[in-house]
Amino acid sequence: MASTWAIQAHMDQNEPLEVKIEEEKYTTRQDWDLRKNNTHSREVFRQYFRQFCYQETSGPREALSRLRELCHQWLRPETHTKEQILELLVLEQFLTILPEELQAWVQEQHPESGEEVVTVLEDLERELDEPGEQVSVHTGEQEMFLQEMVPLRKEGEPSMSLQSMKAQPKYESPELESQQEQVLDVETGNEYGNLKQEVSEEMEPHGNTSSKFENDMSKSARCGETREPEEITEEPSACSREDKQPTCDENGVSLTENSDHTEHQRICPGEESYGCDDCGKAFSQHSYLIEHQRIHTGDRPYKCEECGKAFRGRTVLIRHKIIHTGEKPYKCNECGKAFGRWSALNQHQRLHTGEKHYHCNDCGKAFSQKAGLFHHIKIHTRDKPYQCTQCNKSFSRRSILTQHQGVHTGAKPYECNECGKAFVYNSSLVSHQEIHHKEKCYQCKECGKSFSQSGLIQHQRIHTGEKPYKCDVCEKAFIQRTSLTEHQRIHTGERPYKCDKCGKAFTQRSVLTEHQRIHTGERPYKCDECGNAFRGITSLIQHQRIHTGEKPYQCDECGKAFRQRKKTSYKEILLKNHSEPQAGVNLLLSSLIPEWQSCFRKDL
């Protein structure tokens, strides 16, 4: 059972604040100083300060006294300067205003200042903006396309908000702090806290026994192990897999690449540790401590000769240089795709298994990568921070904005390998490729065209003449429900799609999109025969009939054929219904907006 922390502050402020776990007290000054100087202990005091309740005290004087003591132990004015105290307050507020999913990601990096938070978020944004890939995943007879994304949080991982942080010792690699990337993404969660408490209830907290136990447990938990206390030094690592694979010298953790051994040792501490005087973090080697201390000093001695970007560690610089050299030493055995980082390969390989560990709490939708869940959450929050400077449209992801901007520039980066046709959007390419996948297509027996299953059902109504969706006002019928919905706006006068440039409104979104190209000058539909470009697909189809000679519209009276349907004038509507003039008038009025209908009916 997890222990309950209780704080007792004495009226005499000269006496030290006592922290106890259930009935046990840290009575010696040495134990108290050790806890007081710990970074995680400061976080405990901060939480108690923020969550302090007036009802827990006997009166206002005691409440004020306890608040002063808690704040004193949190901010440490005897060791911190005014600037450092201000930075702590700003950092706390900065973390508080972040969205919950970002709070969890940032807290995992344990930032010490607001600048570190900015660095973490900027690095995360760069990783999320990397172009994705399509990975074919076979499950039974189905084939689905997944998007490669950078993971954010594992399923079941607790939300590391400001109110739920645990006071736990942790060994970290400065390289991983700089890179915001963990080779072995494991955590010291509730199992560690509960196990530590079970042992602490059976042991007297004296000497170095507690310290050694914490080091052993930190080492074990870092490698993803959950052991019983008596098995800590006897059982092999829970994460070892194959005898032939390289393993960690400290705890036998299995590694998939020889190069991972160095990576793993940076997060798996040895017996000796080196502590940072500024923040209390501990490291297994002195060189790691030196590199970490550059976070506090701001020193970045390793500079890239190509782009001038500077780094705190040599290893981080070496990894960065891969961007310029294009070297990708880590290759996927399934599809052959190569990566510059082992962690990127590890994330990519999850796509082939089809596993979806990350679930949305709002709708239950599952994702194989944390980044997929991260982007999906924006659907519920309606967050669209990325805006196009050309047309002012907003998007939830920078990558979608980049794709959209191809509409204005004319860039079509997604090309079909089968026929060479190019598209602005990757989704358009995926839809197009279904034409070539015969096993996924449904072919019309009348004309031979291929469609998806739902598309074929709608298409066949063209041949059968079936129009199941009928307008209640004018009794006009349609093949699709969406066509009926758009048509009914003629009678209601509703024009929900308005142009931001000139204020003109339209009944259909597609008509607005085509209209906006008048302002932007965009003509994305190009004729392959003569090179003429058009704003809309309908205009291109009509134009292409000049080259093909197709004339699909025929006159019922004389049999003459035409390339495009002639628009019916109001006069022709009345002439066609000359035998029933009132029916012609009603049909004509039904095509007008309600305001005009009422005006004309008064004159009739």
UniProtKB/Swiss-Prot annotation:
Q: Which SMART domains match?
A: SCAN (SM00431), ZnF_C2H2 (SM00355)
Query: Glycyl lysine isopeptide (Lys-Gly) (interchain with G-Cter in SUMO2) crosslink: positions?
Result: K20, K25, K196
| Compositionally biased region (Basic and acidic residues) | 213-230
> Which family does the record claim for this protein?
Belongs to the krueppel C2H2-type zinc-finger protein family.
Q: GO terms for CC?
A: nucleus
Q: What is the predominant subcellular site recorded for this chain?
A: nucleus
Species of the source: Gorilla gorilla gorilla (Western lowland gorilla)
- Indicate the transmembrane segments per the record: none
Give a GO biological-process term. regulation of transcription by RNA polymerase II
Could you tell me the keywords of this UniProt record?
DNA-binding, Isopeptide bond, Metal-binding, Nucleus, Repeat, Transcription, Transcription regulation, Ubl conjugation, Zinc, Zinc-finger
InterPro entries hit by this protein: SCAN_dom, SCAN_sf, Znf_C2H2_sf, Znf_C2H2_type
Q: What is this protein called?
A: Zinc finger and SCAN domain-containing protein 12
Map out region (Disordered) in residue numbers.
201-264
Q: Report which gene this protein is encoded by.
A: ZSCAN12
Pinpoint the SCAN box domain residues. 46-128
PROSITE patterns from the entry?
A: SCAN_BOX, ZINC_FINGER_C2H2_1, ZINC_FINGER_C2H2_2
What job does this protein perform?
Answer: May be involved in transcriptional regulation.
Zinc fingers (C2H2-type), renumbered ranges: 274-296, 302-324, 330-352, 358-380, 386-408, 414-436, 442-463, 469-491, 497-519, 525-547, 553-578
Keyword Cell membrane listed? The answer is no
Q: Name one GO molecular function term.
A: zinc ion binding
Q: What compartments host this protein?
A: Nucleus
Taxonomic superkingdom: Eukaryota
